[in-house]
Amino acid sequence: MSPSPLRVGVIGPAGFGGSYLCVELLNRGHTVVGISRNPEKLGKHPRYIPRPIDIDQVPIEELAKQFEGLDVLVSEFGPHTAGAGALLYMPFLESVRKILLAHKICPSSYFLFVGGAGSLHVPGTDLPCVDHPDFFLAYRRAISTSLAHIAYMEERLGIMGTSLRRYREARLAESSRTATEEDKSVIADYEKQIRVKDNASDFIKAGRTAYMFFEDRKTFDWSFVSPSALYRPGKRTGKYEISVDDMVLVGEQQEDKDVFEGRLTGISVADMAIAIADEIEQRKLVWKHWSAWADISEDVPSPAYVGLDAVDGGSR
């Protein structure tokens, strides 16, 4: 628990990362203000204050009022709806712009924005990973090895998760030399689509572009958080490592493989919540673009969302 309990606003408190972060902060003794269309979905707790508002629809000045009285503001903002149709470029960036302008009117002492892995640099370069031609295929291959990630994708994105499971099955058959012609066709079609345009590419590129609103700015205290590529529900290990600007890749690049193949790292949403909560309390990464990664070897499907009944002692 922080020596001085804080009043932390969380945009998107009932979502994937936001719900875990709210639970982590409440367990540390902080007060959480949930800001979204339906923040009450998270549950009830004496130190949880829901402030319902539709960020996409209200004027900037009205949104700014929701930030009053906060020590820290964290944006875990994401699409409202499920499915691939929610993964859009422009709506996300317009909402980010609105949030930043509202924060300018009513600033907190520290603003943390949770983006995505796509803005992280390919190690040794200034190129964002999302702009590297090999990133998406390596990413899809990596998440297809994880039942936890597939279950998460099915829960959030429907058909995209279902097709990923079928792709996994086909790749397993191929590796065991039992692949049918149908399996081979599934692999070829799936990977062809990724090479043309991955269904999530626009949204991941939006996260990359969002970082440009922060980069090199020192007019307010901010921190831009990019969870590592294989970010998913999983075990809370309580341990993590930090990287600034670069995507962490493990092992050495093989001669016949691209720079990402078999080398992507990840973190559970529970451990990412710990990393963000630690930064809220310690403020070691002000004006930094950073990532966290951890051990995700225990591949067990876990809830994509938690409620306030997960707070120590329940919602009492």
Regions found by a protein language model. Give the residues of each.
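N-terminal Rossmann NAD(P)H-binding glycine-rich loop of SDR-like oxidoreductase domains
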Residues: S2-H30
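Mid/C-terminal beta-alpha module of Rossmann-like enzyme folds, strongest
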Residues: R7, I11, G15-F16, K257-R316
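Conserved beta-strand positions in the Rossmann-like core of class I SAM-dependent methyltransferases
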Residues: G9, V33, S223
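Rossmann-fold scaffold of SDR-type NAD(P)-dependent oxidoreductases
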Residues: I11, V72-E76, F113-V114
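NAD(P)H-binding glycine-rich loop region in Rossmannoid oxidoreductase-like domains
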Residues: G34, P39-S108
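Glycine-/Pro-rich loop/turn segments that contact NAD(P) or position catalytic residues
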Residues: T81-R236, Y240
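A conserved pocket-lining segment of Rossmann-fold NAD(P)-dependent short-chain dehydrogenase/reductase
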Residues: R195, E241-I267
